[in-house]
Curated annotation (Swiss-Prot):
Pathway note: tRNA modification; tRNA-queuosine biosynthesis
InterPro entries listed in its UniProt record: QueA, QueA_dom1, QueA_dom2, QueA_sf
Pfam families in the cross-refs: Queuosine_synth
Sections of the chain in a coiled coil: none
Lineage summary: Bacteria, Bacillati, Bacillota, Bacilli, Lactobacillales
Swiss-Prot/TrEMBL GO biological process terms: queuosine biosynthetic process; tRNA wobble guanine modification
Physiological role: Transfers and isomerizes the ribose moiety from AdoMet to the 7-aminomethyl group of 7-deazaguanine (preQ1-tRNA) to give epoxyqueuosine (oQ-tRNA).
Assigned protein family: Belongs to the QueA family.
Protein name, as recorded: S-adenosylmethionine:tRNA ribosyltransferase-isomerase
Superkingdom, natural source: Bacteria
Intracellular or extracellular location(s): Cytoplasm
Assembly mode: Monomer.
Reaction catalyzed: 7-aminomethyl-7-carbaguanosine(34) in tRNA + S-adenosyl-L-methionine = epoxyqueuosine(34) in tRNA + adenine + L-methionine + 2 H(+)
Gene Ontology terms for molecular function: S-adenosylmethionine:tRNA ribosyltransferase-isomerase activity
Length: 344
């Protein structure tokens, strides 16, 4: 029997959607779930170290959120335009979402920051997506840092005092339109402790696209088409993960983006881990056969989202909905700035 969208719905009291990050990253709460027994324990994120064994590997996504939202003016008409950068296709060409899209025809020019940066629409695609080419003097990322703002998820209504709180402490590779949020709980000190305990820290890159927030519209979830995202796992990382595996250690993923990268590679190479890069549209849902990941850290996800489906593929649907109900009863904080789960 195929599952429907309603099977992944749950009632979340509005006040449990975290609007701001907690003061200390690793003081967020942690719901530990044993997927074999269904047993749950309420902890704090800094307790995660007790769950990790020497010889395990913790995998993290080092993608950095770009200040991808730009506000500009069309010199021809004086009309305003909002441009959200999705990803860099080549050179100075970008795939973007534009508002208002219907007025952004091919050839339209938009100026940002008094002309420090201009863009020309080069192609129109479906879903309001526009290809644009930028023109500027200097270094693009520096100009973007000065003119752009970080796009926060639509359910966060409050302004962020410190934009760094929507970046992981190890964010390095520019390219995401949203943060890989499970990683927001790690601090440099906690990662050092993890390393000191004999656990390997492994970094990969997956640039999170806006499809992350796109609702599933098909009742039959098998009909849902995932968005594509760019990923990369380098040679050193693959080598470390293979050594950990050979020595009986666990591969513990931080967040759904790390999971999707590792499972994409495992699916491509018959369960093996090899260095690889490319685009993935993997849709992990109940019935999926896991290839690489042994345990993972993840936040609490939106009702009916593909991310809830991914977690349900690991635990079973009933178990995850029960865990979410427990989290609601215990007043855990949900979504991007919320608390975390450790599922093993």
């Amino acid at each position: 029997m195929s599952l429907t969208l309603e099977d992944f719905d749950y009632d979340l009291p509005h006040e449990l959607i975290a609007q701001t990050p907690i003061k200390k990253r690793d003081s967020s709460r942690l719901l530990e779930l044993d997927r074999q027994t269904g047993e749950m324990q309420d902890k704090h994120f800094y307790d995660i170290i007790d769950q990790l064994n020497p010889g395990d590997a913790v995998v993290m996504n080092n993608s950095r959120v770009m200040p991808a939202r730009l506000y500009g003016v069309k010199p021809e008409t004086g009309g305003h335009a909002e441009v959200l950068l999705l990803h860099n296709t080549e050179g100075d060409e970008w795939e973007t979402l534009m508002k208002p899209a219907k007025r952004a025809k091919v050839g339209t020019v938009i100026s940002f920051g008094d002309g420090k940066l201009t863009a020309t629409v080069t192609a129109e695609k479906e879903d309001g997506i526009r290809m644009i080419e930028f023109h500027y003097d200097g270094i693009f990322m520096e100009i973007l840092e000065s003119l752009g703002e970080t796009p926060l998820p639509p359910y966060i209504k409050e302004k962020l005092d410190d934009p760094d709180r929507y970046q992981t402490v190890y964010a390095k590779e520019n390219g995401s339109a949203a943060a890989p949020t499970a990683g927001l709980h790690w601090t440099k000190e906690l990662l050092q402790k993890v390393q000191d305990k004999g656990i390997k820290l492994v970094y990969l890159t997956l640039h999170v696209g806006l499809g992350t927030f796109r609702p599933v519209e098909e009742d039959n979830i098998d009909d849902h088409k995932m968005h594509s995202e760019f990923y990369r796992l380098d040679e050193d990382a693959a080598k470390t993960l293979n050594e950990v595996r050979q020595n009986g250690g666990r591969i513990i993923a931080t967040g759904t983006t790390s999971i999707r990268t590792l499972e994409t590679i495992g699916s491509k190479f018959d369960g093996e881990i090899k260095p690889d890069s490319g685009w993935t549209d993997i849709f992990i849902k109940p019935g999926y056969q896991w290839k690489v990941v042994d345990a993972f850290i993840t936040n609490f996800h939106l009702p009916k989202s593909t991310l809830v489906m991914l977690v349900a593929a690991f635990t079973g649907r009933d178990m995850i909905l029960k865990a979410y109900q427990h989290a609601i009863d215990e007043k855990y904080r949900f979504f991007s700035f919320g608390d975390a789960m450790f599922i093993h």
